[in-house]
């Protein structure tokens, strides 16, 4: 028996960051980058879906927003596998 095909568009972690965190909190990319102590270009590229979430970035996001780094890395892995 074959498994059903998931036809949903893969979601980049940058979209989640942009739509679920930055927009609702009214937080700018530059403000988040400063809070995470990373270059603003890193966060800009992630929210533009041009850069992957690394373990380092995942740890920083988890510390800042709560939750765990594994969740961010799982989002990235799911995106990469689709």
Model-derived regions: residue spans:
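Residues within the alpha-helical elements of helix-turn-helix
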Residues: 24, 35, 64
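Short, charged recognition helix plus adjacent turn
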Residues: 18, 67, 71-82
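Short alpha-helical "recognition helix" segments of helix-turn-helix
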Residues: 28-34, 61
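Key DNA-contact positions within bacterial/archaeal DNA-binding proteins
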Residues: 30, 41, 70
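Recognition helix of helix-turn-helix/homeodomain-like DNA-binding domains
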Residues: 37-53, 60-62
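A short, Lys/Arg-rich alpha-helix, primarily the initiator
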Residues: 2-27, 74
């Amino acid at each position: 028996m074959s498994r059903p095909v998931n036809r949903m568009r893969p979601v980049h972690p940058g979209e989640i960051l942009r739509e679920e965190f930055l927009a609702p909190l009214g937080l700018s990319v530059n403000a988040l980058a400063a809070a995470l102590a990373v270059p603003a270009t890193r966060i800009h590229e992630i929210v533009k879906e041009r850069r992957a979430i690394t373990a380092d970035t995942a740890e920083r996001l988890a510390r800042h927003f709560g939750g765990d780094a594994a969740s961010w890395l799982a989002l990235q892995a799911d995106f990469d596998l689709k």
